Amino acid sequence: MTGSKLDIEYYQQTSPWTLNGEKIPVVDENEHLGLVVSGLQEEERNIDANIASCRKSLFALLGPCYSFKCLLTPTVQTHLWCTYNLPVLCSGLASLPIRPAIMSPIVVFHHKILRSFLKLSSSSPIPALYFLLGQLPIEAKLHLDFLSLFFTIWNNQHTTIHKVVMYILQMSDNSSITWAAHLRTLCLKYRLPDPLKLLKNEQAWSKQRWSELTKTMITVYHEPEQRLKARRNSKMDYLNVQLQGLSGKPHPALLNVSNTQDIPKLRQHLKMLTGDYLTAERLALDTGSNPKCKLCLAPTENIDHILTKCRATADIKQRMLPELLNSVAIAQPDCIILNLPTQAQYLTQFILDCTSPNLPGNCRIAAHNPLVGTIFHVSRHWCFAASQSRGRLLKQLNKLKH
């Protein structure tokens, strides 16, 4: 038997239940239909149990697919995650009123998973995770499942649960912590029709109509919110997400990865694109150290310096620039990046994301251009070569010092 704290104390001490002369044990929690039933912190305990189950499914079923050395693309890993593991993480939570105050553990776990796909550090910007993979936050996924469960109740108008939900919606106010009151809060948040009116006055819609409406309204809510966070994040100067969405389509930088040799190059490209690459300038902001370049003694070492201006790695630019311009000339011959004056101003941004709204319209490559993948292929190779050359020279410099 389970219950609230008062119930537990009452039945343990004052009036215990008995069966055949023996006391019925009173426990803090129990399992029923895959959920942890508890009078104390029920939502938190179910979230912790689901995280543990999801972690087991990650390593037991597809462990090699998610390892750091795995050479699957982030898009393939994300597809496997959404198909096999995300349902385990969200299983049963639609029947509980999961509020923002208790959602932190599952949100942190979700961020950790997405970062592992993109091979980004724990300090990488969160909006970049969502927009690169085209994925909604875990909060939105839980709310979609929650509203899908409401549709099931709405569609079965002769059941007891339909009457119970309607009664609670009629009697409860905004301070209620019931499932039905949480449903009303979500409908207000996402500008969905009032659930009480739907239960009272309307026949259930088709499943497709309700699913499309909820998915659209939830996406419309979260996209501007994440774009605002991206604009305020100093690390995302090169990753402009104003034209990116959270409807499942990945960023063009993740597409057209044709072989396993591109995967290590993609990792360096994404770290530079998201501002997660550790430069002397970034280190100076965090620790107060000297931001100058250790290789060429320039006053500031940042992403722009590493890719296009460092004299110590100038051979990388000399080798990669003609290859990049040849790819651009084939994909979009009128692109102004082919002009020398424009290169100095926009070259770094073009290398990291040639489809970015940061670039002028006549310098930007359309994301739907069938040859944009060839440009990103050169960009990945450029970022990887610059990073490898820089790392090798820094190691040689450290050996000379010692």
Write out the residue ranges for each language-model feature.
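Family-specific functional microsites
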Residues: 64, 68, 236-402
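Short, conserved catalytic/metal-binding micro-motifs enriched in Asp/Glu and His
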Residues: 30-40, 54, 80, 84-98, ...
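Short, solvent-exposed helix-loop connector elements
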Residues: 38-46, 60-79, 91-104, 127
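Acidic catalytic cores of enzymes that act on phosphate-bearing nucleotides/polynucleotides
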Residues: 105, 109-110, 115-271
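Short helix-capping/linker segments at secondary-structure and domain boundaries
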Residues: 41-44, 88-102, 276-280, 381-387, ...
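Structural motif
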Residues: 23-27, 68-84, 123-124, 132, ...
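Short, conserved micro-motifs composed of acidic
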Residues: 1-28, 49
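Short coil/turn segments at secondary-structure boundaries
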Residues: 67, 92-97, 123-131, 142-145, ...
